[in-house]
Each structure stands twice: as structure tokens, then as C-alpha cells.
Amino acid sequence: ECLVGSEMCIRDSTYTANALVNSILSEFAERASRYKAIVEYSIVIGRSLNMEDIDLCRMLTNILENAVEGCQKVSEEQRIIRLNLHSKGNFLFIKCENSCNEDNLRITNGKYKSSKKNSDKHGYGLKIINGIAEKYNGILNVQVRGGFFAVTTTLCLDENND
């Protein structure tokens, strides 16, 4: 578990034996600390996962990028990101919650839309996450409740994935 939010941020922290995941988590802990966000990681995965590195990278970076951006829209004392990443057997469970300003969220036809300027050029993160979830026969759930935006997915990491 890592708590980040002060000027004392430890670079190159070890969250897991998986080098790719560790690198991504370190980068986003550092990025979140620049915005005074508290980051809590609960990581229980092996050194390797039966998942293409590019998919793992795209999944985690899009989830965490959205979380960091969401936190910027609330006051500093409310900024928090919680990431749970657990593997068991052939399954990978990911849940990321971040504080958010529910008034800033835009929903069109049941889908969350980017609140950035030029939103037609943004908002691909959840589409990418959903595409990867589908590739690994997984499910994706997006929920907003009590000032938190939550992305949850469970992926099946077996040999039969395309």
C-alpha cells in the first residue's frame, strides 16, 4: 500500500514483482502527488500475467489517467485514488475508485463522455478499457456514487483469448 500526497514522494517504489505494472503504478503515484491526491494501492499479482503487455499497459494507464484527471475537479482535501489489482487463477480483477465532481460528469445515451474542451477528440479511455475487457472475455462496470467514480473489470486470462 502506498500513501502519496506530500512533498516526500518515493520514486521507483516497489508495489509488485511485475516490472511493467510497477513502472505504471510508480508513474501515476508521482503524477497524482503533483495534484496532492492520496493514492492507495492494493496489489496482489504474480511476476507475470497471461495478458499481452500492451493490453495491460493500455488498461492501467487509461484507468489511472482518468482517475488523476477526475481528482483534479475536486478540492485538494478530497482527492483520493484507490486501485485494487488482484489475480487469482486465470482471472485478473481491477477496481479503481477516484473522487470526482459528479456535476462535471456528462452522460449521453448511457455512456460517459469527456468533459474536456474539444470532447470529440477525447473520451477514448473508457472505449479502450471496454475493448480490452471484451478481448479477455471480461466485464466492465462503471459507477458513480457518493462522490466517487469507480471502474471495475474482471478479465479471463486463459490461452483462448484472441
Roles of regions detected by a PLM:
Residues 53-76:
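Conserved ATP-binding N-box helix of the HATPase_c
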Residues 17-35:
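Short beta-to-alpha transition helix within the HATPase_c
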Residues 78-90:
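Short beta-strand/loop element within the Bergerat-fold HATPase_c
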Residues 137-147:
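Glycine-rich ATP-binding loops of the HATPase_c
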Residues 13, 17, 39-59, 117:
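Conserved short strand/loop->alpha-helix "switch" segment adjacent to the catalytic nucleotide/phosphoryl-transfer site
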Residues 90-123, 156:
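Glycine-rich/acidic phosphate-handling loop/turn and adjacent ATP-lid/helix
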